Design a protein with these regions (language model features):
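Bacterial Sec-dependent N-terminal signal peptides
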Residues: 1-22
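Short, conserved micro-motifs composed of acidic
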Residues: 21-294, 321, 339, 363-364, ...
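Periplasmic OmpA-like peptidoglycan-binding domain that tethers envelope proteins to the cell wall
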Residues: 211, 216, 414, 422-449
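Solvent-exposed loop/turn segments at secondary-structure junctions
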Residues: 106-107, 160-161, 394, 425-429
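Solvent-exposed, polar/charged alpha-helical surfaces in well-ordered, non-transmembrane soluble domains
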Residues: 45, 94-97, 129, 148-151, ...
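Short, histidine-centered active-site or binding-site loop motifs used for metal coordination
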Residues: 103, 156, 387-388, 423-426
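Periplasmic OmpA/Pal-like peptidoglycan-binding modules at the C-termini of bacterial envelope proteins
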Residues: 265, 273-275, 395, 414-417, ...
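Periplasmic peptidoglycan-binding/tethering modules of Gram-negative envelope proteins
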Residues: 283-310, 314-418
Length: 449
């Protein structure tokens, strides 16, 4: 029964139809792989740790493996979680503060297997709580994975209303903490067959999952789908021979580098072990970096629980992400490498804050935000970091819209506030030309506000 949390792999010779890709599978080291079964390995956002499900005769549990900068294993230990929770099929939110996993046959549950959530607070994990009838049903729910924002959850379920036996569903958490009624992921993902084991890369737009049926290589195969700009999933593509075989494949997850994958495979001694391999170029996701933010009061330096909006300057309309800082004023979130981002922080009683993060190739970035209380805002100079104009013109670029909208909201919320808008150009062109352009840009911003 416990193995139904995940999936069962079997030994069948490699499928011979189609041209095989050159894929080399490398077993993860001893200490991770054991005489028991290891499944569903998933890297954390920094790429230096992996949480996976361990199955023994006695129990199902979670372990965490840690790696150095070169990818060598340093240690393996039980996940810091009460051992009485005999569960697996897990996902951690990108900031590492929310854990959703599967428990089966629990008193007070809604179906055979339900999804439960625990939170990391004050240095420890809270007791898991059933995610409720909003998410769980009288059917089977399992194999969850958090989306990019930590507020979206994909999972597999056999609930009524799907397109086949097991489908992939999506639920979203509101600002009040309530999860929405799950929506079917749609016909681009789900079919009359069984879909499961979803994994959405940290880029938020690349979904990997498994599906059975006669059109694949055999058993369960791995598929990939991309999210279009219309927020619809494109028709999923079989990842092909070399990755898929006549046996079952599932449990794939991607390293933040976008090119390294981990998968569960059935070994010759009939055990499930974890293997990694390099994804073929066409299946790779964009490489990522971790952004660690801390928000403080500029005067007291105490943490501020601000709401942050983070967006790609070049594609603000499709990449916007909103998150709340925790009680320590901290947020951790993934960004695409080599992309420029705008950051806007808002908190009650404070002036809105903006920052611009030029693209770079670092694995980890840090940002400290010091917010100015409204009570002491008079005379303060606020630099709007994400207002952009076309070269030699007062025409605003689209990436300026989020910041200007926030300024408008601040003014509407504080009707007695008066501001002076001052613009500065670069040093290209004559002084007279630049002065004229600065005045034009000031008027343009004033008109938008």
């Amino acid at each position: 029964m416990l193995r139904l949390i995940l999936f069962c792999l079997s030994i069948i010779p490699l499928c011979a139809k189609g041209q095989a890709q050159t894929v080399v599978f490398k077993a993860l080291p001893e200490g991770i792989n054991t005489l028991g079964d290891e499944e569903l390995g998933r890297w954390n956002m920094d790429g230096k740790s992996m949480v996976y499900t361990s199955l023994t005769k006695e129990k199902v549990g979670l372990n965490i493996a840690r790696f150095d900068d070169a990818g060598r294993m340093i240690s393996v230990e039980a996940f810091p979680f009460d051992a009485i929770y005999n569960g697996g099929g897990h996902t951690l939110s990108p900031d590492g503060k929310n854990l959703v996993f599967t428990l089966c046959g629990r008193k007070g549950g809604f179906g055979d297997c339900d999804l439960y959530m625990a939170e990391f607070k004050e240095g420890r994990w809270t007791a898991p709580i059933n995610m409720g009838v909003e998410v769980n049903s009288a059917s089977w729910e399992s194999q969850p994975v958090f989306g990019l924002d930590g507020q979206t959850l994909f999972f597999a379920s056999t609930r009524p209303g799907g397109l086949g036996g097991s489908d992939i569903w999506v639920t979203r958490r509101s600002l009040t903490g309530h999860w929405s009624t799950p929506a079917n992921a749609g016909a681009g993902i789900n079919t009359v067959n069984n879909e499961g084991s979803p994994y959405i890369h940290f880029d938020g737009r690349t979904l990997y999952f498994m599906r059975d049926g006669k059109t694949g290589m055999g058993g369960y195969d791995l598929y990939i789908s991309q999210l279009g700009i219309d927020d619809q999933w494109r028709t999923a593509e079989n990842m092909g021979n070399g990755i898929n075989s006549a046996a079952d494949e599932g449990g794939l997850a991607i390293h933040p580098d976008g090119k390294t994958a981990v998968i569960t495979r059935f070994t010759t001694d009939r055990q499930n072990d974890l293997f990694q391999f390099q994804l073929p170029e066409k299946f790779r996701a964009a490489p990522l970096q971790a952004l660690n933010v801390v928000v403080k009061d500029k005067q007291t330096l105490k943490p501020v629980r601000a709401r942050l909006e983070i967006y790609q300057v070049e594609a603000f309309d499709t990449t916007r992400l909103s998150q709340w800082a925790d009680d320590q004023g901290k947020i951790a979130t993934p960004l695409l490498k080599n992309k420029s981002y705008g950051v806007i922080a808002e908190a009650e009683g404070y002036l809105a804050y903006s920052a611009n993060l030029p693209g770079d190739n670092a694995a980890v970035r840090s940002l400290e935000i010091k917010m100015i209380p409204l009570a002491s805002a008079k005379g303060q100079v606020i630099v709007m970091q994400n207002v952009f104009f076309e070269t030699g013109s007062a025409a605003l670029l689209p990436g300026s819209i989020p910041e200007l909208k926030k300024l408008v909201l601040t003014l509407k919320s504080n009707p007695n506030m008066k501001i002076e808008i001052t613009g500065h150009t670069d040093n290209v062109g004559t002084d007279d030309t630049n002065m004229t352009l600065s005045r034009s840009e000031e008027r343009r911003v004033g008109k938008e506000c």
